[in-house]
């Protein structure tokens, strides 16, 4: 199961690498793109931190043992479903890339 995730991640990184190689940017624009990338990263990290803090505050305010059990059960079911669909997606992607033999 871990090999599938590693393979899917490798394929995504490979596609992104080809996209980066294909986009030839003049030297002058690289500084502007770097600052834009930094701004986007900082913005996403700030959104993530605020969302995480809000979720933690909400969890602390509504902490009940029955609710905690329901959340844990929902998390385990959803991760099982997601891992199933990721496996299906990976298999489909590999068969698409490999082609019919």
Curated annotation (Swiss-Prot):
List GO BP terms, alphabetically.
Answer: lipid catabolic process; lipid transport; positive regulation of phospholipid catabolic process
Please list where the region (Lipid binding) is annotated. Answer: 66-74
PTM notes = Proapolipoprotein C-II is synthesized as a sialic acid containing glycoprotein which is subsequently desialylated prior to its proteolytic processing. Proapolipoprotein C-II, the major form found in plasma undergoes proteolytic cleavage of its N-terminal hexapeptide to generate apolipoprotein C-II, which occurs as the minor form in plasma.
Main subcellular location of this protein, as a coarse class? secreted
Q: Name one Pfam family in it.
A: Apo-CII
Which InterPro entries does the record cross-reference, listed alphabetically? Answer: Apo-CII (IPR008019), ApoC-II_dom_sf (IPR023121)
Spans annotated as Lipoprotein lipase cofactor: 78-101
One of the record's GO cellular component terms? high-density lipoprotein particle
Task: Report keywords, A-Z.
Answer: Chylomicron, Glycoprotein, HDL, LDL, Lipid degradation, Lipid metabolism, Lipid transport, Secreted, Sialic acid, Signal, Transport, VLDL
Q: Which Gene3D superfamilies does the UniProt record give?
A: Apolipoprotein C-II
Q: Where in the cell is it found?
A: Secreted
Named from the GO MF annotations, one term is: phospholipase activator activity
Instruction: Name the domain of life this protein comes from.
Output: Eukaryota
May I ask which residue range the UniProt record assigns to the signal sequence? 1-22
Per the record, the similarity remark reads: Belongs to the apolipoprotein C2 family.
Q: What does this protein do?
A: Component of chylomicrons, very low-density lipoproteins (VLDL), low-density lipoproteins (LDL), and high-density lipoproteins (HDL) in plasma. Plays an important role in lipoprotein metabolism as an activator of lipoprotein lipase. Both proapolipoprotein C-II and apolipoprotein C-II can activate lipoprotein lipase.
Q: Name it.
A: Apolipoprotein C-II
Q: Which organism is it from?
A: Tapirus terrestris (Lowland tapir)
């Amino acid at each position: 199961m871990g090999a599938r995730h590693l393979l899917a991640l490798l394929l995504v990184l490979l596609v992104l690498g080809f996209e980066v190689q294909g986009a030839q940017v003049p030297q002058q624009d690289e500084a502007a793109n770097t600052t834009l990338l930094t701004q986007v990263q900082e913005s996403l990290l700030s959104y993530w931190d605020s969302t995480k803090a809000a979720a933690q505050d909400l969890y602390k305010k509504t902490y009940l043992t029955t609710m905690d059990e329901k959340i844990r059960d929902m998390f385990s079911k959803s991760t099982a479903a997601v891992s199933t669909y990721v496996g299906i997606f990976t298999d489909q992607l590999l068969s698409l890339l490999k082609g019919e033999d």
